[in-house]
Amino acid sequence: MKKRFFTAWVLLILVAVSAWSQQAKYVFYFIGDGMGVNQVNGTEAYRAELEGRIGITPLLFTQFPFATMATTYSANSKITDSAAAGTALATGYKTKNSTLGLLPDLKTEVSSIAVKAQKAGARVGIATSVSIDHATPAAFYAHVPSRDSRYEIGKQLISAGFDFYAGSDFDRPTNRKAPEEGTLYEQSEKAGYTIVRGYKEYQKKARKADKIILFQSEEASKRDRGSIPYSIDREKGDLSLTEITRAGINFLSKDLSKGFFLMVEGGKIDYACHANDAATTFAEVEDFDNAIRVAYEFYEQHPDETLIVVTADHETGGIVLGTGKYDQNLQALKYQRMSVNKLSDKLNELRKKTDNKVTWEMAQQLLGEHFGLGNPLKLNKRQEERLRKAYDENFKDQEAAYDESMYQKDERLATVAKEIINEIAMVGWMSGSHSNGYVPVFSIGAGAEKFCHRADNTDLPKKIAEAAGWE
């Protein structure tokens, strides 16, 4: 009897060890740009308030079985930028701010986990909600001293030869100094890439494509080639991060025997945080979670061979959930129906429509309709005076007053409206830039247990390589 029990116990251990040590064949690496701990916590608390209760309503990825946090400092600064952080997350090496794929000497190239996957025979995809040559996606294929070398980064994207790319567009598709080289679109097609615009065109052309680049529509790029629209502003036909993720999985799954690596960046979380736009930030985090859900559905079909890792490159804005009182009113943000940038556009449209003869009553109506200010959100005297002063600055002269953040320029009245709804919601911001806060790390699947101790951002690609056998 004892012998049988011992044999059964040994078999149980062997089965457990076998499951525990299963290599990851399909790897998802989700990076929420600017998504610190409070961006995640704030989103979940906001969701709970919308349900009329105190607490949190969890996102999908925060329910993954393994969770930890990571440090983010760069080689030359306590506060990283996205290039240095992206390089750390992609290669496992620290570098200087603004640098991509190079050591701090700005000469020595370091390979990313995506390149290691490619060399191991896996199919590779790099995707983002901003331009495909932006810092985070570029860290997986480019080697340049300056993240601003967008055209050169685009050329290196092509030479990297990954199977799938997706983003809003190329930020700088031409080289004015060498027009004979042709555009990056032409160079991509010459290298064997099929370029598609929008998810519907992807569905039509993906099956016959050997390698593919998915961009938003040309019309959308004319409005803003630097990113797809915020989820809170999304209209019918706009490309979404969920569609991008679904396309990536679909394309890389053409030959599942090879396995794959797919990095997906939620790039517009960072944009919203730079603008200190709480409602838009929480909407972007939730949209990021929706994209992760698509990968999770794949995981459910291949649980023993799939690894999903979710993290961030840094925190942006120094968001504070509480501004003095022992309370919050996050539910007020539900009345903000568009980003501050979109509200700025609405004000500009009103100016053009009225030949700059916008009355205070017209402005009030717009603020109430799109931000709920005045109705249903009651304003105190100081808040009303701030809005009226911003209105005067905006419409008394022919030239409107603007406020600039990292990625957008907003009319003063829109900026003040955003500040007031943040105030009503009791959300504070310390800056319009990055901070040195920890970033969260969540994981599930084959090798996920490797991500259960406090880490540095350089540890993550090393652990992924170990889990997948791509060392």
List each language-model region with its residue ranges.
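Boundary at the C-terminal end of the N-terminal hydrophobic targeting segment
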Residues: 19-23
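Bacterial N-terminal signal peptides
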Residues: 8-18
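Bacterial N-terminal signal peptides that target proteins for export
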Residues: 1-9
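A post-motif C-terminal structural segment
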Residues: 25-26, 35-41, 45-87, 134-471
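Extracytoplasmic mature domains of secreted/periplasmic and thylakoid-lumen proteins
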Residues: 93-162, 169
